Amino acid sequence: MNKQNARHRRGLKAKALIRKTGRSRLVVYRSGVHIYSQIVKSDQLGDKVLVASSTIDKELRSSLTGKSKVEQASLVGQLLGKRAKAAGITQVAFDRAGYKYHGRVKALAEGAREAGLDF
């Protein structure tokens, strides 16, 4: 089993546990260059994206130049939190998709908490 498969398996286990809580999930995807986050509501018909933000958002693009990836992730989390508050979402479950809670993933979570999300 390689690293990606192991991360995927960890993520599936976590997703199954989070779905039982009934809360919306704050899902993180981390690529080599960008970081993406979505708040997803799960139900029997499937998943629905309620709010999203990433480093390729037009709102953030100009303010990200010259910043490290960790700083960029924090700004993405803050933008996601701001959009979630505007949509009436205050409580979520953090689905880190098998990634370690460290670096960019941690910075995104802390940025979202600063913006008022509770998880």
Swiss-Prot record:
It comes from Legionella pneumophila subsp. pneumophila (strain Philadelphia 1 / ATCC 33152 / DSM 7513). One of its GO terms (cellular component) is cytosolic large ribosomal subunit. This is Large ribosomal subunit protein uL18. The gene is rplR. Part of the 50S ribosomal subunit; part of the 5S rRNA/L5/L18/L25 subcomplex. Contacts the 5S and 23S rRNAs. CDD domains: Ribosomal_L18_L5e (cd00432). This is one of the proteins that bind and probably mediate the attachment of the 5S RNA into the large ribosomal subunit, where it forms part of the central protuberance. Belongs to the universal ribosomal protein uL18 family. Signal peptide: none annotated. It comes from the Bacteria. NCBIfam families: L18_bact. Gene3D superfamilies: 3.30.420.100. One of its GO terms (biological process) is translation. One of its GO terms (molecular function) is structural constituent of ribosome. Pfam families: Ribosomal_L18p. Keywords: Ribonucleoprotein, Ribosomal protein, RNA-binding, rRNA-binding.
